[in-house]
Curated annotation (Swiss-Prot):
Known partners and oligomeric status: Monomer.
GO function terms (MF aspect): GTP binding; metal ion binding; molybdenum cofactor guanylyltransferase activity
Localization in the cell: Cytoplasm
InterPro entries linked to this entry: MobA-like_NTP_Trfase, Molybde_CF_guanTrfase, Nucleotide-diphossugar_trans
Amino-acid positions noted as binding GTP in the UniProt annotation, renumbered to this chain: L11, C12, G13, K23, D66, D97
Organism: Campylobacter jejuni subsp. jejuni serotype O:23/36 (strain 81-176)
Family note: Belongs to the MobA family.
A UniProt-annotated Pfam family: NTP_transf_3
An annotated GO BP: bis(molybdopterin guanine dinucleotide)molybdenum biosynthetic process
Keyword GTP-binding: yes
Protein name: Molybdenum cofactor guanylyltransferase
């Protein structure tokens, strides 16, 4: 299996409360963070989609909207909505605010898709990264079951589904832009 045979979905539906503004629209090199991620991953994957509660991008991207079945704001709903759009395949899911994840990290996770796992996510010494990994589309119903019980955390899947945590030493590759200072620092590194 090759990366260019797979689909990628960039999650852009977070509340961005710590950032104080919508992270998906932060500007990097004359484009917003969403466009930055879509451009990068379009060179790697078959298709790149954007996941959000509504179309805040004026039809600029292939959008997967959160399902209207549940009136919640959660990563589990986003994952359920994403996986419901695909049939019998792995999908790479990444939060828009993880701009340093790239092909090297993906290639380290890729071999585990051929093994007997349904979830393959990145893990660093300090964190598991549930919004950086491959999820099999067959998990949509399991996500729905959690939502029906008002369980919103993606991490709940890991105890029920065969999951591979792919170990990475470098925390920096999985930088998450939660605060404006982190965004400013990352922006200055791009120059």
């Amino acid at each position: 299996m090759q990366l260019n045979e797979l689909n990628c979905v960039i999650l852009c539906g977070g509340k961005s409360s710590r950032m104080g503004q919508d992270k998906s629209k932060l500007i990097l090199k004359n484009q917003n963070l969403t466009q930055f991620q879509v451009n990068k991953f379009s060179k790697i994957f078959k298709n790149v989609y954007v996941s959000a509660k509504e179309d805040k991008f004026e039809n600029h991207f292939s959008l997967i909207k959160d399902s209207l079945e549940f009136e919640v704001y959660s990563p589990m709903l986003a994952l359920y909505s994403i996986l419901s759009n695909f049939k019998n395949e792995f999908v790479f899911v990444l939060s828009v605010d993880s701009p340093k994840v790239g092909e090297n990290e993906l290639l380290k996770m890729l071999p585990f898709l051929e093994q007997n796992y349904k979830i393959i996510i990145a893990k660093t010494p300090l964190h598991k990264h549930p919004l950086c990994g491959f999820y099999h589309s067959s998990l949509a119903q399991t996500c729905k079951n959690f939502l029906e019980k008002n369980e919103q955390k993606i991490g709940l899947l890991f105890s029920e589904i065969k999951t591979k945590f792919v170990e990475f030493e470098d925390e920096d590759a999985f930088l998450n832009l939660n605060f404006y200072e982190e965004y400013e620092k990352f922006k200055s590194e791009l120059k």
